[in-house]
Amino acid sequence: MSKIIGIDLGTTNSCVAVMEGGEPKVIPNPEGNRTTPSVVAFKNEERQVGEVAKRQAITNPNTIMSVKRHMGTDYKVEIEGKEYTPQEISAIILQNLKASAEAYLGETVTKAVITVPAYFNDAERQATKDAGRIAGLEVERIINEPTAAALAYGLEKQDEEQKILVYDLGGGTFDVSILELADGTFEVISTAGDNRLGGDDFDQVIIDHLVAEFKKENNIDLSQDKMALQRLKDAAEKAKKDLSGVTQTQISLPFISAGAAGPLHLELTLTRAKFEELSANLVERTLEPTRRALKDAGLSASELDRVILVGGSTRIPAVQEAIKRETGKEPYKGVNPDEVVALGAAVQGGVLTGDVEGVLLLDVTPLSLGIETMGGVFTKLIERNTTIPTSKSQVFSTAADNQPAVDIHVLQGERPMSADNKTLGRFQLTDIPPAPRGIPQIEVTFDIDANGIVNVRAKDLGTSKEQAITIQSSSGLSDEEVDRMVKEAEANADADQKRKEEVELRNEADQLVFQTDKVVKDLEGKVDAAEVAKATEAKEALQAAIEKNELEEIRAKKDALQEIVQQLTVKLYEQAQAAAGQAEGAQGAQDAGAKKDNVVDAEFEEVKEDK
């Protein structure tokens, strides 16, 4: 069976892993890094992903970051006259990770397990699945990030029963999950979180502080300057990371702006204490979902056996201190928090292929599901933190006499009124026979699969007429749209490959020009001038083709020059061999002469024996 890769599609960074030799292993990207920034940039119709896209974000307005925050919404971004959905941008990142995995494994990869924040709703999960399809991946399973992290720790190898709290503070989302582990079964008991809280927000408080300090000193608002703002963002991110290891850091941004007297520089010392003061309310915001998850699980902090930290932002000392204070437990930090989720996704991939045995994952739905009933009331059919997959049915009736149809309005959330919850979709059950209100029996069934994706059926028990939908939110993509995007993504991948080959061809041509100059110089006066002239002429023809950027011409001229240079190189080699042979002959003669010169004539006397 082909390998199933595990992908952590993060807000700020993404990571890909695979099972190898019974262990999950992170796959490095072409630059050799173990995580890839979730950044996509477009430049002259060329797509750039990862570090290269992040580096030029300052000068390129067509750069998209933190697109995960828009998954499951109708957000679109226009780039070079074309509109892109969050699913398409995410698919570009997934394609990049898929290519890294294929280069590493030496085989085509078509299947993946992708992780999502535990608190992602149905629309966000469906959007993630669509992104996978667009990238050419069959998404075998969508699993929650905290659950994946628990899998990565290999805790199923422990004999005793354990209750684990996973605290996951990523770049743009925050989740906390409580899991119960016994006999290789990971059962999620409760989950809570905030999809609008993460490391980006910690960066932002530093940026706001820098902007305020600079304005106080120079009366210039840097937040209005796009270039300055990008430099501030980079500096804030670096300062945040520095303050995890040291108690103060220097922020130095020369020529950040200009005033009447000339250029202005930003110089500021940021202490860990100041950073903790600025971010105190963000840290506090993570504790409320932590308390809610414990309450939903019916546990007190003292009943926890272990606390696991996930996500780069958990390196912040104030965050570690807060969770330690809240749970009374020293957080367990055995695996790199940036990689642990991808490793867990790879383990789940191994479970699905049969490479990993004795592990069973039971996840939960993060939000309650139900329908709108009379008076705009939200009637729950499936309560939050119900183990999935699951199915639940309930019988409803009509609200008016002779009502020919019922509208089924499917919602997800915790509020009592429908208007305050998120609409997942609507559909209609028609052709209900005329009858007084309250008589028709309409059975509504909710199914949630192992990916947390919802299917809803409505059935008239009197006529057995049935209507069903797989929930597709207003921002979701139809199958036709996904198929179109898949074709576009494949075409773009081909175009990207073609562009890569073009760049490599130009590089090879430039290298050959340099090599020709060197060979011609080395052969000066040693071969026929006509041969040197022929090589020089072919070199100039190749340079002209490079100038014109005619690829087929570059290829033809390169091949022609390659042949000439090869012949010249052979001659150069032969001459070097001949010179070496001559030098060896001369050395041999010299050694023989030296031996002759060193002969000493000895005097001797012949003694005749007496017979």
UniProtKB/Swiss-Prot annotation:
The gene is dnaK. SUPFAM superfamilies: Actin-like ATPase domain, Heat shock protein 70kD (HSP70), C-terminal subdomain, Heat shock protein 70kD (HSP70), peptide-binding domain. PANTHER family: HEAT SHOCK PROTEIN 70KDA. InterPro entries: ATPase_NBD (IPR043129), Chaperone_DnaK (IPR012725), Heat_shock_70_CS (IPR018181), HSP70_C_sf (IPR029048), HSP70_peptide-bd_sf (IPR029047), Hsp_70_fam (IPR013126). Acts as a chaperone. Induction: By stress conditions e.g. heat shock. Pfam families: HSP70. This is Chaperone protein DnaK. It comes from Bacillus cereus (strain AH187). Transmembrane segments: none annotated. Keywords: ATP-binding, Chaperone, Nucleotide-binding, Phosphoprotein, Stress response. The modification Phosphothreonine is found at T173.
